[in-house]
Regions:
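Active-site substrate-recognition segment that forms the wall
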Residues: 1-106
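C-terminal catalytic lobe of FAD-dependent flavoproteins
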Residues: 79-151
Length: 151
């Protein structure tokens, strides 16, 4: 067996903004066309964008405007953009994370490719990976890194 020639991880640039909004009063994460995560002191993380072509970590005005427009469609209160962050997230071709061990490296465990849904799926995926390692329970086929093997 050998691992497929396709790349396991595909870089995907994402940007988010940080807003100040004393009026918002959100106490838990909201996920719609954007995520809104309460931080502290009326600050919120809002995002994110997707860009498979640009692999820089430079913020862009286009991404900022896109998020502001989407945010205005979701909330009905004033806010001020106080920061913007860009980074590269790991994604996979089939948009599924990969978890588990390679056949030849049982002592190396993978937990990657979560992409944009990672923020909401990481807790349950971590539980699945824990049960795989500690309790010998199988990982779901669609998330098992072994799906990349050619038999």
């Amino acid at each position: 067996t050998k691992i497929s020639n396709e790349p396991l991880v595909i870089p995907n640039k994402g940007e988010y903004i940080i807003i100040n909004s004393p009026e918002l009063k959100l106490y838990s994460m909201l996920k719609t066309s954007l995520f809104i995560i309460p931080l502290t002191n009326d600050l919120y993380k809002v995002g994110a964008t997707y860009d498979r072509e640009d692999h820089t970590v430079k913020t862009t005005q286009n991404a900022k405007e896109e998020m502001i427009n989407k945010l205005k469609a979701i909330i009905n209160c004033n806010f001020e953009v106080v920061g913007q962050v860009a980074g590269i997230r790991p994604t996979t071709r089939d948009r599924r994370p990969f978890l588990g061990t390679l056949l030849e490296c049982k002592n190396k465990v993978f937990f990657n490719g979560l992409g944009t849904r990672g923020i909401t799926s990481a807790p349950s995926l971590a539980k699945s990976l824990y049960n795989y390692i500690e309790n010998d329970l199988e990982l779901p086929k669609e998330m098992n890194i072994k799906r990349y093997y050619k038999w």
